[in-house]
Amino acid sequence: MKINQPAVAGTLESGDVMIRIAPLDTQDIDLQINSSVEKQFGDAIRTTILEVLARYNVRGVQLNVDDKGALDCILRARLEALLARASGIPALPWEDCQ
């Protein structure tokens, strides 16, 4: 999946996460995480984000994650919505990502 434009998904409310994405000129993934629960769940948050990016074959992006204690399912949903917005597609290709 090609990220064409910057995008934002989520809120800064308790129990939610705000994620910002922007395309990079390289194939690197620049991941910055700021979380109220980073000491306990920082590795799990990072793993979840990288799993979703790998599933949709996303490379060459800068991600800024401001987590306020979001559950894993919320993190995944926000990230998938963000990828759809940033790539300019109306819906994710669910059948291709199994």
Swiss-Prot record:
It is found in: Cytoplasm. Disulfide bonds: none annotated. The modification O-(phosphoribosyl dephospho-coenzyme A)serine is found at residue 14. GO terms for cellular component: cytoplasm. The keyword Membrane does not apply. InterPro entries: CitD (IPR006495), Mal_deCO2ase/Cit_lyase_ACP (IPR023439). It comes from the Bacteria. Keywords: Cytoplasm, Phosphoprotein. Belongs to the CitD family. Oligomer with a subunit composition of (alpha,beta,gamma)6. Covalent carrier of the coenzyme of citrate lyase. This is Citrate lyase acyl carrier protein. It comes from Escherichia coli O81 (strain ED1a).
